[in-house]
Amino acid sequence: MWLVLAFTSAALLGFYDVFKKQALKGNDVVAVLTLNTFFSSLIFLPLVILSATGALSPDSIFYVPSCGWEVHKYVILKAVIVLASWLCGYFALKQLPLTIVGPINATRPVMVLLGAIFVFGERLNLWQWTGVLCAIVGFYFLSRSGKREGIDFRHNRWIVLAVMASAFGAVSALYDKFLLAPAESGGVGLNRMVVQSYFMFYQFLMMIPVLLIMKWNGNEKDERKDIGVVERKKASFLSHSSLFSSSMFSFRLSIPLVSLFLCAADFVYFYALTLPGALIAVVSMIRRGSVLVSFCIGALAFHEKNLRYKAVDLALVLLSMVFLYLGSR
């Protein structure tokens, strides 16, 4: 059952990536991310209220138990890790082709596996080491494909941010295992709905000061530029400039769709991890299979280039996941 849920989460995550690329295209990154966390919070807010008032039964899969600081401190750290991944990933995805970012994200299971070695003391078998090697080779060939589009993996800051996003995502996956695992297994034993609901709320609260700071920074730049020329026009609340983006903000239907598909994908993901026998490495690997959806739809929707070369690179990354699966059986 958990395997079926993992594949479902992967499909939802693929559409999430496509909508995210559409939402970010020529748009303000910080404003889009702030609204994504806002809409995600709105999705879970009714569940928290219904659970607190007793309208939802504790036996419901949507029930959110009440909890204190001892639980919330773990969720806040989860929110920080995920938000760091999203900030890096959003900036990278706006500037890079989806057919480049997708395969980079697909290497995340390898990072999770390597992290499991150092954090949980796990040992890799021959199949898993073969998978790691395939991922490294695939990443190398992906860098060569990027050069055909003028993207130098060694000196491109957006590539660095994409890799950092994947690294933070791998840390988040390992932290999920720690949070959801029962105490007798060395984990915290948190309820999955508590984690998913409240980390969305905390992310939105964290994004508010980020948005205000970036708005103030952008307005300050506008004032310096316009002194002695013309009076600066009153800026819209969400039309600021930033270090990475000077785009104006425009609301699109794809923005709430990002939140909807993300929440659905994460709900299925967290539920899968709570089922008996669920393996975090395998679930994480299957979720990265979302790259097939985002790669195919992204290639058609955004008319991206060098697809033949990138398809070979992607095949190597997917082959690495097959080896990881064989090694995890």
For the regions a language model picked out, list residue spans one by one.
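Hydrophobic alpha-helical transmembrane segments of multi-pass integral membrane proteins
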Residues: 2-5, 30-52, 160-164, 168, ...
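Hydrophobic/aromatic residues within transmembrane alpha-helices
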Residues: 23, 32, 92, 118-124, ...
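Hydrophobic/small/kink-forming positions within alpha-helical transmembrane segments
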Residues: 14, 45, 79, 83, ...
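Juxtamembrane helix-loop boundary signature in multi-pass membrane transporters
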Residues: 1-7, 11, 110-172, 177, ...
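Structural motif at transmembrane-helix junctions in multi-pass transporters
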Residues: 25-32, 87-104, 184-193, 267-288
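Membrane-interface helix-cap regions at the ends of transmembrane helices
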Residues: 41-70, 118, 140-150, 204-251, ...
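Alpha-helical transmembrane segments of compact multi-pass small-molecule transporters, enriched
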Residues: 39-43, 104-118, 202-206, 265, ...
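Loop-to-transmembrane-helix transition segments
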Residues: 2-8, 56-88, 105, 157-167, ...
